[in-house]
Amino acid sequence: MASQGTKRSYEQMETGGERQDATEIRASVGRMIGGIGRFYIQMCTELKLSDYEGRLIQNSITIERMVLSAFDERRNKYLEEHPSAGKDPKKTGGPIYRRIDGKWMRELILYDKEEIRRIWRQANNGEDATAGLTHIMIWHSNLNDATYQRTRALVRTGMDPRMCSLMQGSTLPRRSGAAGAAVKGVGTIVMELIRMIKRGINDRNFWRGENGRRTRIAYERMCNILKGKFQTAAQRAMMDQVRESRNPGNAEIEDLIFLARSALILRGSVAHKSCLPACVYGLAVASGHDFEREGYSLVGIDPFKLLQNSQVFSLIRPNENPAHKSQLVWMACHSAAFEDLRVSGFIRGKRVVPRGKLSTRGVQIASNENVEAMDSSTLELRSRYWAIRTRSGGNTNQQKASAGQISVQPTFSVQRNLPFERATVMAAFVGNTEGRTSDMRTEIIRMMESAKPEDLSFQGRGVFELSDEKATNPIVPSFDMNNEGSYFFGDNAEEYDN
């Protein structure tokens, strides 16, 4: 397991590879990206999409969802065993948007899953290329993170909606493997564990028998993944307690919520990777770029360079602001939903506004919306600088934060102070230091109280000019310490509903 001391880079998790050197990793990630690009080109040919239609992000998402659905073995099996009226378990499809006589039209397409699997394997040298599928899942997850809030889900599990910065990857399917686990926030895993424990409380047989044994293994594995994200001994020791509990119940739920809260100040390590829509990879492959030969990294300059010269379009609803739609997709591309807006804005070279001030809804368009009334516009996905993505939470300190989000989860490895509001976070920690984890709780609270506002995280780390591919001259930005830094401030986003 990636969490047990064998530190593999994201790229190794991403490509399922064992330890490799940097060149091999770049090549295998490149192979994965090239496969996605080739698949996309082939699908555009099958669907007879024009160049313009192939660059439409809504078409890209439909094609991506089709291949994910075609390879979702569990769900496919379930659909075959529980046939529902009007749904063919062997087919997958979605809306494709075409430009006809100066208007956008929606066409619902249907394909055999078997056919989609064949096209995907053919694009990936005959292999299943699970890594590429996971990569697409992470792109969808990053898009959801930037688009929706998870207030309801947080409240349902007894957590505070202001803890949204811990919820990265909360819509990732379970089958997303080690690469998926790496990008999940502390709150996401806490929520999964709490759901398990609640089922165990309500269902006597949940932990029993052969199935229960498997459940128990999954529970302990998830505990280990979460433990691996924490950076302090006391937090890890508390996770050991939760993992070793004979019969997990309310005490464990309490401990997990305590740990999630503590992660607002003593942040966990959460990986960030730039995962782009399939059409971007398709465009690059079509223009002759050989990803495997050139190599590719999800955490370096490569995604920035790719976005610098890709033109992607999006459908825009009548009252939406195209610049805001671009910001949403830019944030999703760089997994920056929970990043400090000061940092994102500096790198992007444009002011980045909080979610509540965006005049845009999600990228996907519901089946009952009138497409003919919509126009399309170019998404501005370019950046002024680039920065290395981080896999750590940065060390921690505080600053006045906002009503909507009381902490950040850094995406870019750039020197700054990390905003959170100590008063708000600490208010949740009154009393309740009794019980078997009391000494650990006391220690965690002590560490949180000593976190200082002026402390800089990622010291000396900066952003780079796009011409500086080898990252030789870091530019360390200076930020206004008192500026509003959180994206979900004063939020009015839609809830995420499956």
From Swiss-Prot:
Instruction: Alphabetically list the UniProt keywords.
Output: Capsid protein, Helical capsid protein, Host nucleus, Host-virus interaction, Ribonucleoprotein, RNA-binding, Viral nucleoprotein, Viral penetration into host nucleus, Virion, Virus entry into host cell
Asked if the record carries the keyword RNA-binding, the reply is: yes
Post-translational modification as stated in the protein's UniProt record: Late in virus-infected cells, may be cleaved from a 56-kDa protein to a 53-kDa protein by a cellular caspase. This cleavage might be a marker for the onset of apoptosis in infected cells or have a specific function in virus host interaction.
Which Pfam families is this protein grouped with? Answer: Flu_NP
Q: Does the keyword Electron transport apply?
A: no
**Cross-referenced InterPro entries, in alphabetical order?**
Flu_NP
Motif Unconventional nuclear localization signal per record, residues? 1-18
> Which one GO biological process term can you cite for this protein?
symbiont entry into host cell
Q: Give its localization.
A: Virion; Host nucleus
Record's compositionally biased regions (Basic and acidic residues): 8-22
Molecular function terms in GO for this entry?
Answer: RNA binding; structural molecule activity
Residue segments, region Disordered: 1-22
Q: Which SUPFAM superfamilies match?
A: flu NP-like (SSF161003)
Chief place of localization: virion
Gene Ontology cellular-component annotations:
helical viral capsid; host cell; host cell nucleus; ribonucleoprotein complex; viral nucleocapsid
Q: Where is this motif: Bipartite nuclear localization signal?
A: 198-216
Q: Which family does it belong to?
A: Belongs to the influenza viruses nucleoprotein family.
Q: Which HAMAP family match?
A: INFV_NCAP (MF_04070)
Q: What is this protein called?
A: Nucleoprotein
User: Which organism is this protein's natural source?
Assistant: Influenza A virus (strain A/Swine/Wisconsin/1/1957 H1N1)
